[in-house]
């Protein structure tokens, strides 16, 4: 009977969910019972699903937060804007300011250079917003 109780406890722990942002490299991809599309996908997953996703070379975990953490924090930025802004700022900081392919004559980062270094397309408005957020 105690073995059954232990198995039940294991099943209960596998049902603990977290919210994860998963980046998919393919147009459509299915793993761990979840359908993903190219780009970032915000999904609710169990710890078992998260382990399967972490082991997959087509998917990468951008972030993962337990349900308790989200409740304490007051929610999740479902659009991932804060995370994207942080990544844009880090990318711009890593560009060569002396390289005319990276920056305009006025000192603005070029969209093409930021998108290439970031590994995903971003707009001029997104870059400006990310940099303005850092100045605020």
From Swiss-Prot:
Broad class of the protein's primary localization: host cell
Keywords: Host cytoplasm, Late protein
Induction: Expressed in the late phase of the viral replicative cycle. Expression of late genes is activated by the viral late transcription activator C.
A Pfam match: FluMu_N
Localisation: Host cytoplasm
SUPFAM superfamilies (alphabetical): PriA/YqbF domain
Entry superkingdom: Viruses
Name of the protein this chain belongs to: Uncharacterized protein gp35
């Amino acid at each position: 009977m105690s073995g059954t109780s232990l198995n039940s406890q294991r099943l209960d722990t596998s049902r603990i969910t977290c919210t994860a942002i998963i980046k998919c490299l393919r147009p459509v991809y299915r793993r761990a019972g979840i359908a993903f599309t190219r780009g970032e996908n915000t999904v609710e997953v169990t710890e078992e699903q998260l382990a399967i996703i972490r082991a997959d070379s087509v998917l990468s975990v951008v972030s993962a937060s337990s349900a308790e953490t989200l409740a304490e924090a007051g929610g999740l930025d479902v659009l991932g804007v804060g995370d994207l802004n942080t990544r844009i700022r880090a990318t711009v900081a890593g560009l060569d300011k002396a390289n005319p392919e990276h920056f305009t004559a006025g000192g603005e980062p070029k969209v093409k250079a930021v998108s290439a270094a970031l590994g995903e397309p971003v707009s001029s408005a997104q870059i400006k917003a990310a940099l303005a957020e850092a100045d605020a």
